[in-house]
């Protein structure tokens, strides 16, 4: 029986995880399509570029990875202690490199004064974003969604590019 990833990933047990993402509809992630002769090798660079970008934002280290013709493998280290050491401002600066943030976070970073109610919601948002910065699911979501959108645009199609959300296995299980 399958388990939700939030139940599979326990940073108290291990911080290292092996994540796998597979393509659907016989889509090529990279390599050459034997039937059409079309090369998708440039997509490997998409993955490497996005990995470099998000590795600077998230508190997750990429220990190893492999990009195959229709799937990827990543060995990730989730560093929640690093995320907890970040200042509130550092958390928001990192988060805003990938996402727009909220009105409260934008005002805070702009140096605007926040009333007590806004400060209350800002504190909740910072706590949530801090947790996400060491969350493997969020890391894989950002990576896979970016690649899927580019590949779907290139392939002139819509819908899922990856079969399921990425699967995370502890290194013991892998």
Question: Model features per residue range: what roles?
Answer:
Residues 1-174:
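Short catalytic/metal-binding and nucleic-acid-binding patches
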């Amino acid at each position: 029986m399958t388990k939700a990833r939030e139940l599979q990933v326990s940073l108290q047990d291990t911080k290292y995880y092996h994540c796998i993402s597979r393509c659907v509809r016989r889509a090529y992630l990279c390599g050459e399509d034997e039937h059409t002769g079309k090369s998708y090798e440039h997509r490997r660079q998409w993955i490497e570029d996005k990995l470099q970008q998000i590795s600077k934002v998230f508190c997750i280290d990429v220990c190893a990875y492999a990009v195959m013709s229709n799937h990827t493998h990543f060995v990730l280290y989730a560093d929640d202690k690093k995320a907890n050491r970040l200042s509130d401002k550092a958390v928001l600066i990192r988060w805003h490199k990938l996402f727009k943030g909220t009105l409260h976070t934008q005002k805070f970073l702009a140096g605007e004064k926040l009333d007590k109610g806004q400060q209350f919601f800002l504190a909740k948002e910072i706590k949530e974003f801090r947790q996400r910065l060491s969350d493997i699911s969020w890391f894989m979501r950002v990576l896979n969604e970016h690649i899927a959108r580019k590949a779907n645009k290139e392939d002139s199609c819509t819908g899922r590019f990856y079969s399921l959300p990425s699967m995370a296995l502890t290194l013991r299980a892998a």
